[in-house]
Amino acid sequence: MPLVDPVIERVLADFERRAEEEQRRTAAPGSPGTNLDDFLLSVGRDVGMLLYLLSTGAQSRRILELGTSYGYSTVWLAAAARSTGGKVTSLELREFKIESARQALTRAGLSSRVEFHAGDCLDTLKTLSGPFDFVLLDVWKDLYLPCFELVHPKLAPGGVIVADNMLLPAMVRPQAEAYRARVRKAGDMDSVMLDIGNGIEVSRKR
């Protein structure tokens, strides 16, 4: 399902071509070891569209992204923010990734919709006041639990957290299971896992 805006679609298509090329390169026999920082590691088209639909459907104006990477999901969230009149606050450890994401957002005409914070996401989260209507959690998986502890009090009633990589890669499944268990014990969260992309947990605060 395409977005209405062809400019945004072209930017997303560029990301998706890069992701396909990365997959082909790493799948080739004898491919050398790679630095994960060089890869998009994006949520993919289906999850991206779901992020857009969930955040626009809920008219989310205060959107938080934990893990900008190169900006694929940021473009989806910024497109949603433009639709709702909102803003995205995006956190990323690596400055060079933020710069790459900025360039993509500029090409998409969405740069005014995103505010970036560089540095450790836990340190940054402590400085953000919230409340947030919509949160995407897509950082290193050992950070999911501490991120949830900091985000949960800042989530608005009716606010949604989407956490990626609940099923894949298999090596992070223990952390994913621990995250899901914690969310479901929170007492004020309704939560479901969806088998799309690499598996996502969608959680809503009552």
Regions found by a protein language model. Name each.
Residues 1-134, 141-162, 167-206:
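A short alpha-helical cap/connector motif
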